[in-house]
Design a protein with these regions (language model features):
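Pepsin/retropepsin-fold aspartyl endopeptidases
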Residues: 1-119
């Protein structure tokens, strides 16, 4: 499934899944919610409503620790790939956040680690 998004390359952004070392991109969940498959939507709706229900195994959910100026949290992440034009980087994770208020400047944020995979 492809999900076109408004991406923003932030050279100061760095997020990795600590167990695998995979690069992580950050996605604003409200901006893409209606474009995600139903199973992902249901799980993420529950996550952001503070449900403790486990994710369906087929989603391949990872929990990624995140530290920012807003504090520390765990973000749900799904396997993903990043494509910019003809360049494609697989083996990434897309972590979902639900900022208040949402930032209209971007839907997906990626850092240097993900950008290097596109080369």
């Amino acid at each position: 499934m492809q999900l076109p998004v408004q991406a923003f390359h932030d050279t100061g952004f760095a997020l990795q899944e600590p167990l695998s070392g995979k690069a992580v991109v950050l996605v604003q969940y409200p901006a893409v919610r209606h474009r995600l498959p139903q199973a992902a939507r249901q799980y993420l709706d529950g996550w952001f409503a503070h449900s403790t229900a486990p994710p369906p195994p087929e989603l391949g959910v990872h929990l990624v620790p995140c530290r920012s100026i807003h504090g520390q949290s765990m973000l749900p992440a799904l396997p993903a790939a990043l494509q910019l034009g003809k360049d494609r980087a697989g083996g990434l994770l897309a972590a979902f956040c639900c900022p208040t208020p949402p930032d209209p400047a971007w839907e997906l944020l990626y850092g240097e680690d993900a950008a290097q995979l596109l080369l």
